[in-house]
A protein has these predicted regions:
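PLP-dependent aminotransferase-class I/II
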Residues: 112-122
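Structural motif
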Residues: 31-32, 72-74, 95-96, 121
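Conserved PLP-anchoring active-site segment centered on the Schiff-base-forming lysine
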Residues: 89-107
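Catalytic cores of large soluble enzymes that bind and process phosphate-bearing ligands
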Residues: 52-56, 99, 103, 122
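Short conserved active-site loop signatures built around small residues
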Residues: 2-32
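Solvent-exposed alpha-helices and their adjacent loops that cap or buttress functional pockets
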Residues: 24-27, 65-67, 89-90
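Conserved N-terminal alpha-helix of the aminotransferase class I/II PLP-enzyme fold
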Residues: 33, 37-84, 106-113
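Short, surface-exposed connector motifs at secondary-structure boundaries
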Residues: 67-70, 91-96, 116-118
Length: 122
């Protein structure tokens, strides 16, 4: 059973889910790792920021997943990364997108300039 299933309250989930023991200094909360380069001890795990697999991304994904009661979560570097990932995951050639007039300019540009190539008109 995953630890996200044993904690119920929002505050408890935010505090405990995904927590790792600070072996080096014995801290009471999970450490934050400011680095972007990691030693590859376990060759089965690719640690690289663009794979959303750094320790910070993994801890945060577990917390978000528990809060949203989902199987998993992905942590991205920007809102545009989230928007483009979401749209590209669900849209196929021949689908249509309807946008509101005052949508964020970066989103409008992505959809109008790039999605046309994939046969997804606005």
């Amino acid at each position: 059973m995953s630890d996200k299933n044993i904690y119920k309250g929002v505050n408890t989930i935010c505090t405990h889910v995904g927590q790792v023991k600070d072996e080096q200094f014995g801290g009471s909360v999970s450490p934050i790792y400011p680095g972007t380069s990691y030693e590859y001890i376990d060759k089965e795990i690719d640690r690289y920021p663009r794979y959303s697999s750094t320790p910070n991304q993994e801890f945060l994904a577990k917390k978000i997943s528990a809060l949203e009661e989902t199987e998993d979560a992905i942590i991205l570097g920007s809102g545009m990364a989230a928007i483009s990932t979401s749209l590209l995951a669900f849209l196929n050639s021949g689908d249509h997108i309807v946008l509101q007039n005052d949508i964020y300019g970066g989103s409008r540009n992505l959809v109008e300039a790039q999605f046309k190539r994939y046969g997804i008109p606005v």
